[in-house]
Design a protein with these regions (language model features):
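P-loop/Walker A phosphate-binding loop and immediately adjacent motor/lid segment at beta-alpha junctions
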Residues: 40-46, 54, 160-202
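Conserved, well-folded catalytic cores of nucleic-acid-processing
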Residues: 57-58, 74-77, 109, 151-154
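Phosphate-binding/switch region of NTP-binding enzymes
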Residues: 115-186
């Protein structure tokens, strides 16, 4: 089975920057937007425009680490695509079911690959942080965080350094990782080192 990791964070919080130490062949990067990476690199981003294409692309990936960047936009684009051919109240359920199916496909792949889903974070009126969706109806039917035991938050710490928060520091935090996987509440913003270090073995 593949390993699924979810990384949530605001725009500019260092999600994509955490890929800076990967070399060509070590990682596949998939994006619905095809944005250039925010650092000089030989790595290329593969443009995969919608969920239907994503479903076909995932089994074809070869690198040990696969990044699905800007994952929220798959929901936005798919919802817009089916807005007029579905009942307005059924469309969110359809989108949620389809995206959940993608994550299930990843989990049950017969592979040792690690798939990292990067997405923007949402904060509700009570301060609870979750995977950002395209509306309340969709949020009711979609909880990607529940499909993995590794959810990290990309953020800036008190010293101005970009880090991944890996342990829940409040009941409103989305983060969770297996017990004893990490010794600290946060780790450096570097997914490559996380692949090689123990106990921080992503």
């Amino acid at each position: 089975m593949a390993r699924l990791i979810i990384i949530l964070g605001n725009s500019g919080s260092g999600k994509s920057t955490s890929l800076r130490n990967f070399k060509k062949g070590e990682v596949n990067i998939i994006s619905p937007l095809g944005k250039e990476l925010p650092f000089r690199t030989e790595l290329k981003t593969t443009l995969v425009k919608d969920i239907d294409m994503l479903k076909k692309a995932i089994p074809k990936t070869k690198a040990p680490v696969v990044i699905i960047d800007d994952a929220n936009y798959y929901l936005t684009l798919y919802k817009a695509k089916h807005l007029f051919d579905k009942n307005p109240y059924e469309a969110p359920k359809y989108v949620a079911h389809t995206f959940t199916g993608i994550l299930e496909d990843i989990i049950f792949l017969d592979t040792e690959q690690t798939f990292v889903v990067m997405a923007h974070i949402d904060k509700d009126s009570e301060g609870y942080k979750t995977f950002k969706t395209t509306g309340a109806f969709l949020k009711d039917d979609l909880l990607p965080e529940g499909m993995t035991n590794i959810v990290m938050e990309s953020k800036m710490d008190d010293t101005g350094e970009y880090v991944f928060e890996v342990k829940r520091t409040s009941d409103r935090s989305p983060t969770k990782t297996p017990m004893d996987m990490f010794e600290t509440d946060s780790v450096p913003n570097d997914l490559k080192s996380g692949q090689n270090e123990k106990p921080a073995n992503l």
